[in-house]
């Protein structure tokens, strides 16, 4: 088996101990477990990215769920957020099946790669700004090792802000004043850079209250595919939004 640089980076991430609070939380959750998962051997470590390393669409999420990814060891796997996300990815042609239950379930992602702003499950699903910054170097290296990305889909405002912080640090963008988070909004950040699509996160809170429906999320990924295949100039709503931002 040939290991790509992105694979070697994931192995490095597995050994990370930069955030003592997160590591303690992950191992404690893995030891105590939830009653429904007492027969599981929890992953309890940093969760690696997952998907097609040559994909044109990159999903950036928030962080692993305590009894989801922290249990299964795969992004968005084993909780309600993943149930919604993979159902949508299957319907829109990015996933081989609509369910994601374990690392051994046979799921294959096509033309899409999934990563997160933080790699360890945080208490209350809220990593601190420092913990997100601790993970950022891994995220930046992933961006450099994914050669075909045309569209970045940020699930939630934290992921959106984290990606923009990377672009600002790298000098790709200046002011962020015109880049305002919202659902299914598309942005051209700079020439030669991937398009950015912001989306509500498929959290249980958002989906159970109807703030985000599967149809709304599917619209995001249909747009992501369209932009990846045809470019932003073929997306009329993107053109309209960019004209308001002063883009071409």
Positions of predicted regions on the chain:
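Short, low-complexity, charge-dense intrinsically disordered segments
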Residues: 233-240, 244-248
